[in-house]
């Protein structure tokens, strides 16, 4: 190690640390390591260069708590950005922002190491074809389909099933596509991260997923950069292995929030609502790397927390510009016992177009939405006057809409433990066939209950015969 790559800490302000170098100037985003002896244990603290202050002094952001740092301590420049392990060895493991495993297992030492700061694929490398990504979940595939290499926003409050949908998607991608997933917990509750790990272990999907956690309790640097750590692992599988990878970010709002904290600590002038002036650029730099190339794709599902339910807040607004589809979870649907509690009228997708999906899929999806909307409009009349006052046509619409509502429910593989009914993966062709039959009136003779918590329409027909 060159002597002049060793600097001295000159100032510590919480997570912001200034380091003086003589003769060597670390570049922006370069990692600097400090060895701290805290209460008899040696720990490695990584700092990331955020600004040059002049005269060989750099301002850095700490990737962990800065307790134990003192002025005059040695800090060693590494000559490169933070590097994390990638490849097969990361599957089934939990990592922190600097690529160390935090799951009590052995550290990953013999895997390729990639920098977390990377350029997005060149324009000529990117794939321009729009292709649907089949999830095996009826309501998603029919009404708000995901695109390969696209970005999906998962909106929902606490306890409506965001995590269960994420786990089911990981399971179905592993089963239906032989694909891999990467989960980045950005500013997550530590308890939720722990629950997710154990639930994945119990559902046998852990060996197909890499987990990266930067919890709420960590400094803003770790919460911000953890999204890049997870994305780098996903990029390896896309670029080197040619796979279709699913990338989960929970929660993308915390990425913007931690960026705003870092910006304030670095002394930048805040922008609207106190956010960092570079919010759109930071969000764009992350989202730009999530894309399809001619080799493989990264499809991302991002949980979006909306502060105070204000969709015009700059953080969620900066995410919307990048999304191809939105899956909205609704508490009222969950209260009816219909899971997944996806709102069929609020969820949307830019793929819902006859030129992309074909006429049949498009017409069935629109027919389902029209029937459900008409039922919603008739509910006030039903509440006041009862069903008897409706015309025959309206009665048919109400009955079909109730069957559609029930048929949008589906038993999940990862929820078998709670529901006791085996999970179902429903192919797109079966999904379209089932809803087409309900809309055309072929299922008018079947009882409503036969559509609840089944896979395809054939299963509902079998159930109806048993109920007679």
Curated annotation (Swiss-Prot):
The keyword Metal-binding does not apply. PROSITE patterns: ATPASE_ALPHA_BETA. Keywords: ATP synthesis, ATP-binding, Cell inner membrane, Cell membrane, CF(1), Hydrogen ion transport, Ion transport, Membrane, Nucleotide-binding, Translocase, Transport. It is a peripheral membrane protein. Its EC number is 7.1.2.2. ATP binds at residues 156-163. Its main location: membrane. It is found in: Cell inner membrane. Pfam families: ATP-synt_ab, ATP-synt_ab_N, ATP-synt_VA_C. InterPro entries: AAA+_ATPase, ATP-synt_VA_C, ATP_synth_F1_bsu, ATPase_a/bsu_AS, ATPase_alpha/beta_chains, ATPase_F1/V1/A1_a/bsu_N, ATPase_F1/V1/A1_a/bsu_N_sf, ATPase_F1/V1/A1_a/bsu_nucl-bd. It is an enzyme of class 7 (translocase). It catalyses: ATP + H2O + 4 H(+)(in) = ADP + phosphate + 5 H(+)(out). GO terms for molecular function: ATP binding; ATP hydrolysis activity; proton-transporting ATP synthase activity, rotational mechanism. One of its GO terms (cellular component) is proton-transporting ATP synthase complex. The keyword GTP-binding does not apply. Produces ATP from ADP in the presence of a proton gradient across the membrane. The catalytic sites are hosted primarily by the beta subunits. Belongs to the ATPase alpha/beta chains family. F-type ATPases have 2 components, CF(1) - the catalytic core - and CF(0) - the membrane proton channel. CF(1) has five subunits: alpha(3), beta(3), gamma(1), delta(1), epsilon(1). CF(0) has three main subunits: a(1), b(2) and c(9-12). The alpha and beta chains form an alternating ring which encloses part of the gamma chain. CF(1) is attached to CF(0) by a central stalk formed by the gamma and epsilon chains, while a peripheral stalk is formed by the delta and b chains. This is ATP synthase subunit beta. The lineage of its organism: Bacteria, Pseudomonadati, Campylobacterota, Epsilonproteobacteria, Campylobacterales. The gene is atpD.
């Amino acid at each position: 190690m060159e002597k002049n790559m060793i600097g001295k800490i000159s100032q510590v302000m919480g997570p912001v640390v200034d380091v003086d170098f003589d003769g060597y100037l670390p570049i922006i985003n370069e990692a600097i390591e400090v060895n701290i002896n805290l209460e008899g244990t040696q720990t490695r603290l990584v700092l990331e260069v955020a600004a040059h202050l002049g005269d060989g002094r750099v301002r850095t952001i700490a990737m962990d708590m800065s307790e134990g740092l003192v002025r005059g301590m040695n800090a060693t420049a590494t000559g490169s950005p933070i590097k994390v392990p990638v490849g097969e060895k990361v599957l089934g493991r939990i990592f922190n922002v600097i690529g160390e495993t935090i799951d009590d297992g052995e550290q990953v030492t013999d895997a390729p190491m990639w920098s977390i700061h990377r350029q997005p694929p060149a324009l000529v490398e990117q794939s321009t074809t729009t292709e649907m990504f089949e999830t095996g979940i009826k309501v998603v595939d029919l009404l708000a389909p995901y695109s390969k290499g696209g970005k999906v926003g998962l909106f929902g409050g606490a306890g409506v099933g965001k995590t269960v949908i994420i786990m089911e998607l990981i399971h179905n991608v592993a089963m239906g596509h032989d694909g891999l997933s990467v989960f980045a917990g950005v500013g997550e509750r530590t308890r939720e991260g722990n629950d997710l790990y154990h639930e994945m272990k119990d559902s046998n999907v852990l060996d197909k997923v890499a987990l990266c956690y930067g919890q709420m309790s960590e400094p803003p640097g770790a919460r911000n950069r953890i999204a890049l750590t997870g994305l780098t692992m996903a990029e390896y599988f896309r670029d080197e292995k040619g796979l279709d990878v699913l990338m989960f970010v929970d929660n993308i709002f915390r990425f913007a929030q931690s960026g705003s904290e870092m910006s304030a600590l670095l002394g930048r002038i805040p922008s609207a609502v106190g956010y960092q002036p570079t919010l759109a650029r930071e969000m764009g730099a992350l989202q730009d790397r999530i894309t399809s190339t001619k080799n493989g794709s990264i499809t991302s599902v991002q949980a979006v927390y909306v502060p105070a339910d204000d969709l015009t807040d700059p953080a969620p607004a900066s995410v919307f510009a990048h999304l191809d589809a939105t899956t909205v979870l609704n508490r009222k649907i969950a209260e009816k016992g219909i899971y997944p509690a996806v709102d069929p009228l609020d969820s949307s997708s830019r793929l819902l177009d006859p030129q992309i999906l074909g006429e049949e899929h498009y017409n069935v999806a629109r027919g389902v939405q029209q029937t459900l909307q008409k039922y919603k409009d008739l509910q006030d009349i039903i509440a006041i006057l009862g069903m008897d006052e409706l015309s025959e046509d309206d009665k048919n619409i109400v009955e079909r809409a109730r069957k559609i509502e029930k048929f949008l429910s589906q038993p999940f593989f990862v929820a078998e433990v709670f529901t006791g009914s085996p999970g179902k993966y429903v192919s797109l062709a079966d999904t379209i066939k089932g809803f087409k039959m309900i809309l055309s009136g072929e299922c008018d003779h079947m009882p409503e209950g036969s559509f609840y918590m089944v896979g395809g329409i054939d299963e509902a027909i079998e159930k109806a015969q048993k109920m007679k």
